[in-house]
C-alpha cells in the first residue's frame, strides 16, 4: 500500500549522511533511469531540487558510472523516488530489479558464467566492486533442492532498502539461472533485531 504522505525530512537526510560507505555511480544512474521511465524528466528534476533542499548540493548530471559516491546519496535518491512517484514496496522492489537490468557492466558479465554455483561463490567479490560498505556472504547453494542463502552484514541505512535488495538479488538469480520462476524471501533483518540481513532464493 502506498504511503501518500511519505516525505523525506532534512533530519533523515542528515542521519543518512553520517553513515559511512560508498557506491559506484552506475548504481545511482540505474536508479535515476527508473525514475525517468516512471516519471519522465520532470521527476528527475524534482529529485535534483529535493536533494538541494535536503542539503545535498550535487549535480546528478555529473555522476560518472565508475566513480564512487556516498551510499547515503544512493539511498536518499531511492527514498525521494518513493516520495515523488508515490511508490509502494513493490515499486522499490522493481527499482532494485531494474538496477541490474540497465547495468552495462554487471548483467552482461553474469551471463558469461556457465555455472550458477560459480557465480554464487563470486557474489561477495561483485558486492565489493560495487559497494564499499558492508559485505555479502554466500552462505549455501543447493542445486539439487533448488535454493540458495545469502547474507548482507554491516549494512543498515533504511528499511526500504531491504525491498530494493530483494529485487536486485532476484534479478541476479533469474539472470544466472536462466529461469523466470524464482522467488526470494528476507528471513532475517537488522531492522527487526537480527545481526544481519538474510535472503533465501528458491527456484523451479
Protein language model features and the residues they cover:
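Short, mixed-charge aromatic SLiMs
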Residues: 51-60, 101-106, 188-200
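Short terminal or interdomain "cap/linker" segment that borders an active site or interface and mediates
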Residues: 2-25, 128-166, 170, 174-204
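N-terminal low-complexity or simple alpha-helical regulatory segments
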Residues: 2-101
Amino acid at each position: 500500500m502506498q504511503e501518500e504522505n511519505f516525505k523525506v525530512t532534512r533530519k533523515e537526510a542528515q542521519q543518512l549522511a553520517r553513515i559511512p560507505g560508498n557506491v559506484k555511480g552506475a548504481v545511482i544512474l540505474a536508479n535515476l533511469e527508473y525514475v525517468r521511465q516512471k516519471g519522465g524528466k520532470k521527476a528527475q528534476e524534482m529529485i535534483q531540487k529535493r536533494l538541494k533542499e535536503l542539503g545535498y548540493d550535487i549535480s546528478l548530471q555529473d555522476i560518472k558510472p565508475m566513480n564512487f559516491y556516498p551510499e547515503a546519496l544512493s539511498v536518499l535518491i531511492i527514498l525521494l523516488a518513493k516520495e515523488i512517484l508515490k511508490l509502494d514496496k513493490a515499486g522499490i522492489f522493481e527499482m532494485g530489479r531494474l538496477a541490474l537490468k540497465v547495468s552495462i557492466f554487471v548483467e552482461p558479465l553474469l551471463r558469461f558464467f556457465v555455472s550458477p554455483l560459480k557465480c554464487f561463490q563470486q557474489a561477495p567479490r561483485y558486492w565489493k566492486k560495487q559497494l564499499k560498505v558492508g559485505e555479502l556472504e554466500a552462505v549455501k547453494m543447493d542445486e539439487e533442492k533448488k535454493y540458495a542463502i545469502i547474507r548482507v552484514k554491516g549494512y543498515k541505512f533504511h528499511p526500504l532498502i531491504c525491498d530494493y535488495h530483494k529485487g536486485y538479488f532476484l534479478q541476479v538469480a533469474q539472470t544466472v539461472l536462466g529461469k523466470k520462476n524464482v522467488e526470494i524471501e528476507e528471513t532475517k533483518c537488522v531492522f527487526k533485531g537480527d545481526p544481519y540481513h538474510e535472503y533465501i532464493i528458491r527456484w523451479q
